[in-house]
Amino acid sequence: MIRLAYRCAVPILAASLVACVPFESLWRKTKPAAKPEAAAVVEPQLPLAEATHRFIVSPEQDVVGRLQVTVSREEDTLADLARRFNVGYTEILRANPGVDPWLPGEGTQIVLPTEFVLPDAAREGLVLNLAAMRIYYYPKREKGAPIEVITHPIGIGKVGWSTPEGSTKVISHVKDPVWTPPVSVRQEHAKDGDILPATVPPGPENPLGRHMMKLAWPSYLIHGTNKPPGVGMRASHGCIRLYPEDISRLYESVPDGTRVTVVNQPYLLGWRGDRLLVQTHEPLEDDKRDWSDVPKNLRQNARRPRTPLWKRIAEHDDAIDWDMVRIAAAEPRGIAFPIGPGTGRDLAATLAEAPRVRNAIPRGATWDGVEDQYAGDPQFAKPDDADETKTSTSP
């Protein structure tokens, strides 16, 4: 049922985003009338969530963040909640099977997948896990200094335009970029009757958003977006998209020359203290690997450990509940839970123990709640109604 719901909801949203169809209804809704103060008594008693994008980790730690649960309001969509809590659309959709993504409804419990198992990759520069649709940034540090990691959701290339795996680097930064659609992209759009211009100037119609980092891979970029609901989806032509508020911070902190490592790891194991956690994501549609027996695949890594993570897993292989891994792989919800050593916890117990938080922008979040990323910039100021009327009637 999880996979069916995901496959039904995502293509509808993706089609609108890829085809550049206006998507105002999802993100910019008419503000509902204010409710009587008495109607909002219960929720403010819940604690405000802490932002889950920046962490300090030890070399032995592989899991950051914490699973949380909130309650939706009548006007919410899952896309609203995803941006509010800095997760991607697919992440929140998979974590909440059976919840209507467009109308979750007043009082519906919403699982916030804000606990993350780090990819098994060198903790250096930018690390992207395509299957999880997440980026991790490890800033340079002095020897002996704590390890910092910053993580955000990303959108990646759609089927047929996959984001490549491997290693590259950031070679330049561009603020308010001009978009020059490649010939291949213009041809694809033309087949659907959508004629793209040769260039798109900076501004609200530019799909690159306000910040762009070029990679050494030709034609591949890390950039913002003018359609935030597409973050956490496969809707690009291979580039990596972030929420405007996230790319603006990475743009300022990631220097040219930063290493970029792209991996594709749908099934993640990681240590938090002396407990091993599993986090499963559905493999990408064009992932050609055989995942019919996930525990077997993972245990092969333990038999030939190449990293400290797998060496430690190999030492505790007999104490790990591999049957629980099989169950998690069969219904991938992106929720991490322990599988040993010792008594593990199933998904239901993990959800029951998750803290309940207020449905509001978390403390320390990257987003301030302003949907228009161009607001306050006179360069992109919108004309007032009088000016618009005058322009439309002029010869």
Q: What is the predicted role of each segment?
A:
Residues 75, 105-110, 257-260:
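Loop/turn positions that initiate beta-strands
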Residues 119-226, 252, 280-281, 286-391:
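Gly/Pro-biased beta-strand-loop elements
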Residues 51-86:
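Primarily a LysM-type cell-wall glycan-binding module
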